Amino acid sequence: MKVIFLKDVKGKGKKGEIKNVADGYANNFLFKQGLAIEATPANLKALEAQKQKEQRQAAEELANAKKLKEQLEKLTVTIPAKAGEGGRLFGSITSKQIAESLQAQHGLKLDKRKIELADAIRALGYTNVPVKLHPEVTATLKVHVTEQK
């Protein structure tokens, strides 16, 4: 019997796959557990429509990420911090502070987990910070750390 898997089934198939399985296995296990549905023409059409919808959403997310990348690369975020001799900061600038400053100064809300700081910023001056907006899109944000008077 041909079935469409609704969820990943170890050793049998992944979500969205169409495979031939034994009738008893399909009727007694896959259908009852909600892991698969029968591969009828109507169900195949619904699966195709769902795949197209997911592709459109993925393309839309990618386009939004590219647009946000263009915006971010034009911006500079200024963060005042207390510093000692030689431009060394007391403490450090974290991704959370960068995200909050970006929101306050430019009105762009960005999740702090998307800001990829290798190490926290510990010195005054300009730093280029990578921001992963999408698995395929990474922007570079300029962060200017100034001395707080």
From Swiss-Prot:
Tree of life domain: Bacteria
Regions annotated as coiled coil: none
Recorded GO CC terms: ribonucleoprotein complex; ribosome
Keyword Zinc-finger attached: no
GO molecular function, one term: rRNA binding
SUPFAM superfamilies xref list: L9 N-domain-like, Ribosomal protein L9 C-domain
One BP term from GO: translation
Keywords per UniProt: Ribonucleoprotein, Ribosomal protein, RNA-binding, rRNA-binding
Keyword tRNA processing (UniProt): no
Classification via Gene3D superfamilies: Ribosomal protein L9, C-terminal domain, Ribosomal protein L9, N-terminal domain
PANTHER family referenced in this protein's UniProt entry, alphabetically: 50S RIBOSOMAL PROTEIN L9 (PTHR21368)
Protein family: Belongs to the bacterial ribosomal protein bL9 family.
Annotated function: Binds to the 23S rRNA.
Name of this protein: Large ribosomal subunit protein bL9
Gene field: rplI
